[in-house]
């Protein structure tokens, strides 16, 4: 089962290492990790995607609460249940002729992707969506054009509505 855990922690050396170390000590794999400072420069927001049983996710959440460097921990729900998640995808495509370029432009419009760089044979597209939407976008592109390179930012998430994550 897929679990997205959002953590508010100190923005200082070693804090992220302690969080990651906890996962490692318990034998939990991190599928995706995204960290950045918040509007408060003393805090960072860390989003971790992991897979495992529900009780394992609850256990790791309880252990994270015990770390001194951690202020808040929240398990983000699926979008239908009250969570929002997004990731940025950059895809470099080989587009050797006009027919393929036109097809890529049409697909970019359908997926609300943007062409951010192009030359005679290469298009670079930018796409923002959920992990599932990103997977679908990449898979669909791969069926019509040769993908040269894919870069994914990693997952970020936030609760819907009036739920806030503050220390």
Task: Describe every region a protein language model picked out.
Residues 1-167:
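A conserved regulatory-domain signal marking ACT and ACT-like small-molecule sensing domains
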């Amino acid at each position: 089962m897929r679990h997205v855990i959002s953590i508010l922690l100190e923005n200082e050396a070693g804090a992220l290492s302690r969080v990651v170390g906890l996962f490692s000590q318990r034998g939990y794999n991190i599928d995706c990790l995204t960290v950045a400072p918040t509007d408060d420069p003393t805090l960072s927001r860390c989003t971790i995607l992991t897979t495992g049983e529900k009780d394992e996710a609850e256990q790791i959440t309880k252990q994270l609460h015990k770390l001194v460097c951690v202020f808040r921990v929240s398990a983000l729900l699926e979008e239908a249940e009250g969570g929002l998640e997004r990731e940025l995808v950059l895809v470099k495509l080989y587009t050797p002729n006009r027919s393929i370029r036109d097809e890529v432009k049409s697909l970019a419009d359908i997926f609300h992707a943007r062409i951010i760089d192009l030359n005679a044979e290469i298009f670079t597209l930018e796409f923002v969506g959920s992990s599932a939407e990103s997977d679908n976008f990449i898979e669909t592109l791969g069926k019509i054009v040769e993908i040269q390179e894919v870069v994914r930012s990693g997952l970020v998430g936030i609760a819907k509505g009036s739920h806030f994550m503050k220390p």
